[in-house]
Design a protein with these regions (language model features):
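Active-site glycine-centered loops adjacent to acidic/histidine catalytic or metal-binding residues
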Residues: 51
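Structured mid-to-C-terminal alpha-helical surface segments
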Residues: 1-46, 56-62, 66-68, 72-328
Length: 328
């Protein structure tokens, strides 16, 4: 466990251009990831995703990301998963408590998700928290999970973590942008574009991931992509949600970024007829992933727990005969 000295943190944060307290949170987050990687169970069963994976393993820390979002990484029967889940929770709890964190009442445990909120007193003497979320229903992935290096300029020791594939991470990130229209999502997707992370040959798979996660992630699959929602990000949210995690002096030109992102997404987010059939069937409670994927990708997600659960729920709501998770 690294020591969090107020003066040292202040100097380092100033050198890097970040807010000290937010910088401290990322240092703590990195410490937790280091513990995960050194644990035989946590390192194999938990895959990093979301903004933290983007900014710590794909890009070179363009912004700070302050939550640890994870997927259970192995597809296994529910009973086996629950046994492993209990062991994972126990190991995380013991580590966090031994290092001065206290589990907050804001923590939640659902059948699909564990959301652990751990409170601590930061180096400035203020109360703060670190959130660790583990999704157990997203334990199937379109692409194989990969081990990636963590890029943090202040770390001397090499660190790598198990991670969801970058294409799949950004597929889910684009879905988040088009549905919750958060400033940080817009920032991350814009960085995907400006850093040219994916070439033309990868855009087809990126679109398929957006199609897939737009179906299983919401109450209803879309009929088309709501790219116009990019325009709903507000200037106020830049000040409140984005600037606190950026380097001092960095400016975010909202209108220009919105136009660039809209143009880029419009260029490849055009669902095929087959993908529209997938959406239509999913809305009726029928899981037909073969209209989106084939080969190894199809095999990996054909028994996707979240997709099957969503379809069973839809079937029950419309009082139709249940379909037992088959690929036809």
């Amino acid at each position: 466990m690294m020591q969090f000295d107020r003066m040292a943190l202040g100097r380092q944060a100033k050198e890097l251009g970040f807010v000290r307290d937010t910088f401290e949170k990322v240092c703590r987050l990195a410490d937790v990831l280091k513990f995960f990687e050194g644990d035989d169970l946590l390192s194999e069963y938990l895959a990093l995703k979301g903004g933290t994976a983007i900014n710590l393993t794909i890009l070179d820390l363009p912004r700070l990301s302050v939550d640890i979002d994870l997927d259970f990484s192995k597809n296994m029967p529910r009973e086996e998963m629950l046994e492993v889940r209990e062991m994972l929770s126990s190991r995380i709890s013991k580590y966090m408590e031994a290092n001065g964190y206290r589990l907050s009442p804001k923590s939640k445990n659902h059948h699909a998700l564990d959301s652990f909120v751990y409170e601590y007193q930061n180096a400035g003497g203020m109360k703060d928290n670190l959130k660790i979320e583990i999704n157990y229903m997203l334990r199937c992935h379109v692409l194989p999970v990969v081990r990636r290096k963590v890029y943090l300029p202040w770390m001397t020791d090499e660190l790598s973590v198990l991670s969801v594939d970058p294409i799949e991470i950004f597929g889910a990130k684009i879905v988040a942008l088009l549905t919750r229209t958060a400033t940080r999502d817009l920032y991350d997707v814009h960085n995907m574009i400006t850093h040219e992370l994916f070439d033309e040959s990868q855009l087809d798979m990126l679109r398929k991931c957006v199609v897939f996660y737009s179906a299983i992630g919401g109450e209803h699959p879309p009929k088309e992509f709501a790219i116009e929602n990019v325009g709903k990000v507000t200037k106020r949210s830049i000040t409140t949600d984005l600037y606190p995690v950026l380097r001092h002096g960095e400016r975010f030109e909202l209108t220009a970024v919105q136009n660039e992102v809209r143009t880029y997404l419009s260029g490849f987010l055009n669902p095929t007829k087959e993908e529209q059939i997938f959406w239509s069937a999913f809305e009726k409670g029928i899981y037909e992933p073969q209209f989106v994927f084939e080969g190894a990708e199809l095999q990996r997600i054909k028994e996707h727990p979240m997709a099957l659960w969503k379809c069973r729920s839809k079937e029950q709501n419309i009082k139709t005969e249940p379909v037992k998770g088959r690929v036809r």
